[in-house]
Amino acid sequence: MLTKSQKTKQRVLEAALSLLQNGEPGKVRMADIAKQAEITRQALYLHYPNRADLLIATTRYLDEVNGIDDLLRPSREAKTGIERLDHFIDVWGNYMPKVYGIVRALIRVYDTDQAAAAAWDDRKAAVRHGCAAITRALKQDGLLEPKQQDATDILTTLLSLQNWEQLTQECGWSQSKYLQYIKHISKLSLMSRSAD
């Protein structure tokens, strides 16, 4: 059972998420979120002292609502680096359509809105963390070709929202085609030829 404080935080996060999904992140103010959550601005600031903290919490809440930890469990529990890579690409590739609207909005104001930039940077760091775990697993399996840092950079770039957007939204690829080719390209880029 949630405490009163937890219920208020949840209401705030739901309000922030709704406003971000239905508006422009750069124009969503703390006062707007407080009003939507039916609390005072002062009460909002007790929970989130600044807009950046609130936007970061909101994007993490979006992950929680979508059950990202449960979705990633097969990747995290995979026995091999290749299994981990395949599971992670499946999860992230299929997750992007769910968060596309809000992430695209954050990216659009990235250069002019520090709070939105902080929220997007936080999510990119989470993806990079997953990519680093994959490259570590591939290295432990003796399959990693480039240096681990370079491999993490490559995989993070391959799995970027911008690449997904280009292929699925601009080029019209289906999700299954995107997943198939990103897995193939990732393996070609990361794994030694002897692993083929």
Task: Report residues per predicted region.
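Helix-turn-helix
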Residues: 11, 19-53, 57
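N-terminal intrinsically disordered/low-complexity leader segments
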Residues: 1-7
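Short helix-capping/turn signature of helix-turn-helix
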Residues: 48, 108-112, 158
